[in-house]
């Protein structure tokens, strides 16, 4: 006679998997356990967790092994080499057995009840489900944004709503953890052309044929750990070039719709360059690498001069601007204070003119 555990395992294996939570990870041994802890107790017989490790050099394998041993619906695949985030997420969908795949980051948290809410939404049989997310600081102790989109109620998109979906959700889709997509939809679309874009999910969603049925869940289902992205060192390149080039590459959306998502050439905007200088993401190194031969003579001179502005001065001015004129920008203030460009003067400003409810906002970021 089979033991109870053997019977339970047999029952799980015989259940059709409805939802696969798909994580692509690399070198996140310091944080991935928190992410897994937020997921595993929500797993049900018809839900699995698939983790693809792109050859992490740290202790990720040993950490995940504990979860594989304890939870039958957790699967771990370690690749021999790192193929990049896009290809690794594509692999997670390939390994998945669920009808739907939730593309989950390896450092954020799934909110309590999230899987149950998504399983309920799956009953509507949409091709695509997108979920709202809240944003918190690195240790999750403070909320920076309660909602990334500001949309208060669930929204449904049908045939003919592709451009509305694009404008409503384009910016939100910079966060891959918002995406739950039907696996057959993902598999029959061109993914290879988006390898290296860092946003394979966006390419899959907005290529032709258009998504004809989508749902946006307005209640946050994920908590984002702000400032912990693997791509932090490439921030300027990503937001000035890779992201806008991807958005403006889609031929089936109007130019005004694309502009609502992102400017095609944000690097031409002097205020955008100053903001990046204030956050320590733009310097003469980026000018030399990306802008020295780009644009008009005026563009080149302007970008060069901005690179000469002391980063600490740019940061102080930016913090002053936020605490006096943008007092709802909690995330913007935290981002500035968390920068290496922030000095005691910037932190003094934040303490002296705190945003509403944020008297200790400066204490959650680094201070020099």
Task: Describe the residue ranges of each PLM region.
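C-terminal subregions of glycosyltransferases and related glycan-biosynthesis enzymes
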Residues: 203-206, 210, 216-368
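Nucleotide-sugar donor-binding/catalytic module of glycosyltransferases
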Residues: 2-245
């Amino acid at each position: 006679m089979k033991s109870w555990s053997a019977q339970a395992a047999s029952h799980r294996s015989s259940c059709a998997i409805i939802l696969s939570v798909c994580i692509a990870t690399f070198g996140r041994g310091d944080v991935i356990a928190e992410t897994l802890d937020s997921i595993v107790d929500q797993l049900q017989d018809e839900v699995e967790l698939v983790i693809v490790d792109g050859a992490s050099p740290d202790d990720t394998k040993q950490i995940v092994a504990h979860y594989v041993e304890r939870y039958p619906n957790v699967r771990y695949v370690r690749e021999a080499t790192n193929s990049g985030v896009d290809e690794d997420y594509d692999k997670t969908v390939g390994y998945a057995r669920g009808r739907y795949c939730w593309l989950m980051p390896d450092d954020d948290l799934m909110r309590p009840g999230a899987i149950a809410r998504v399983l309920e939404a799956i009953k509507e049989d949409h091709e695509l489900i997108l979920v709202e997310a809240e944003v918190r600081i690195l240790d999750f102790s403070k909320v920076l944004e309660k909602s990334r989109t500001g949309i208060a109620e669930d929204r449904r998109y049908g045939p003919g709503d592709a451009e509305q979906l694009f404008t409503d959700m384009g910016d939100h889709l910079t966060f891959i953890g918002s995406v739950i997509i039907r696996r057959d939809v993902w598999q029959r679309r061109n993914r290879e052309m988006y390898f290296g874009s860092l946003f394979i999910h966006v390419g899959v969603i907005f290529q032709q044929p258009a998504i004809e049925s989508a749902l946006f869940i307005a209640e946050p289902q994920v908590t984002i750990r702000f400032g912990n992205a693997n791509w932090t060192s490439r921030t300027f390149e990503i937001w000035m070039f890779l992201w806008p080039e991807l958005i403006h590459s889609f031929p089936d959306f109007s130019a005004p719709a694309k502009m609502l998502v992102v400017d095609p050439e944000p690097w031409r905007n002097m205020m955008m360059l100053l903001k990046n200088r204030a956050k320590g993401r733009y310097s003469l190194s980026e000018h030399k690498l990306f802008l020295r031969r780009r644009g008009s003579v005026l563009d080149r001179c302007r970008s060069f001069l901005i690179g000469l502005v002391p980063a600490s001065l740019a940061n102080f001015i930016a913090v002053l601007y936020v605490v006096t004129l943008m007092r709802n920008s909690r995330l913007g203030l935290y981002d500035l204070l968390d920068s290496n460009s922030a000095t005691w003067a910037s932190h003094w400003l934040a303490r002296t003119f705190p945003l509403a409810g944020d008297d200790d906002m400066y204490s959650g970021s680094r201070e020099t």
